[in-house]
Amino acid sequence: MTRQHRSIPLLLAFLLTATAAWAAIPLKTVTGTLDTIWGDSPDGDTYQRWFLTDDQGASIELMVEQLPPRGFAEWNRQRAEVTFEDDPLLSGPKRVRAVRLVDVGENNLRADGSAPISGSKPWVSILCKFSDIAAEPENLSFFQNMYGNNPGQLDHYWREVSYGAIDVVGSTAIAWVDLPRPQTGYIPTPGSGSNANLSLLFNECTAAADPFVDFSNGGSPFEGINMMFNGVLDCCAWGGSRFATLDGTSRSWRTTWEPPWGYRDAGVIAHEMGHGFGLPHSNNSDGDSNPYDSPWDVMSAAVAYSISDATYGRLGKHTVSYHKDRLDWIPANKIYTADSDGQHVVTVDDLAQATVSNYRMIKIPLGGNVLYTVEVRDRTGGYDGNVPGRAVIIHHVDPARAADAEVIDGDSPAANFADTEGVMWKVGETFEDSGNEITVRVDSSTADGFRVTVTRGSATDIFADGFESGNTSAWSDSQS
């Protein structure tokens, strides 16, 4: 007993000392631009890194432990005042204590944190060689033609996926240039880890290319920069954005860092460019840490169930309806929102079709920014030709998750990969969320999609007036 009593003041003394030490960590506040970058590994691992670049161009890597309610997009590419721990004895990312957005009125975020993208978005590929690696894995024409408008090339791809909302006309590539350092000068252990010095790679790759490219593009700056390296980086290919001043233009440049395996498959390039456009991962719903488990989205399993091209390898698929809506690629009159109690009978057409007569997606709000989405996928178009099948696909969306959209799987437990019958809702099948009193029933197949009934509220409330035996055609909603 005596020994136990002695341990209590000792423990309290330790806790007080630790608390005092934590409280004594110096804090620093810096104003600059926040950018996030995703790392994508072929082994299924993913990483997300945050950087704050101040007005003098100095970049600080941050440790972000909690995202805002609207998810990463609320901070990404935004000007902010960030307070972080600045312990001189510790190296590595700085732990964030507070973030306050500034110049909020100048950004184009919508209420859900998304940012519309439209028009021509030219990119430039800069090809950078480590000083100790002489190989040039592909020639200049390979990278220049990658941006073409033939099937399998990126201008054609982004036009189809966005329904013509964006293109990459004006994109180009410049010939291989030499970096001033060897591979290990940027990556401590090439091919492993997640600690490539992305800032140094960006700074020295763009500097090496600067004599040969005008990043300001004659007053119409390039939208993004694809950096193509001639050796592996760390674990990953990386995509996101990076604030910098290049040729007099200061902005968050949409940016990718690509090892050779990244540009051998155009689907990987499309995935990383998608991060550049502000898209996170989507996922299946098995609860593991691997976000590459959905073959329905280029932002998940980028090259699974993909079409192959003789030159550009495995191509990207379409992204999911929620992501297209985030970027404002689906017109409001092609989105049905089931936000009231009752039955909503809706005809939904295949998401990959260039034009549709009916709706492209259904939204079912759950409160806040959380919702279900309903879309139809089929083996159609130039890039969805090998998806697992023709079906209604339902996602649960929460922007506060790292992978915001998760495919609903009717099987329990959920499959490890979302290519099973459990995720493909077909005629006669019903998804039910009893807690929110929501059902989604697939009623029938149409020429271009499916007729779906969304029911909100309990059946007792819905049919309290006894009209269920009458004509319900007034509750239907389709377009002609």
Language-model features: locations:
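Bacterial N-terminal signal peptides that target proteins for export
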Residues: 2-10
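Bacterial N-terminal signal peptides
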Residues: 9-19
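Structural detector for short beta-strands of small beta-barrel domains
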Residues: 24-46
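OB-fold (S1/OB) nucleic-acid-binding surfaces
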Residues: 42-63
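Non-catalytic C-terminal accessory/binding modules of secreted extracellular proteins
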Residues: 64-70, 241-263, 336-460
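Zn2+-dependent metallopeptidase catalytic core
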Residues: 69-79, 85-92, 100-270, 350, ...
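Extracellular hydrolytic enzyme modules, especially secreted metalloproteases
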Residues: 219, 223-383
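Extracellular carbohydrate-recognition regions
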Residues: 460-479
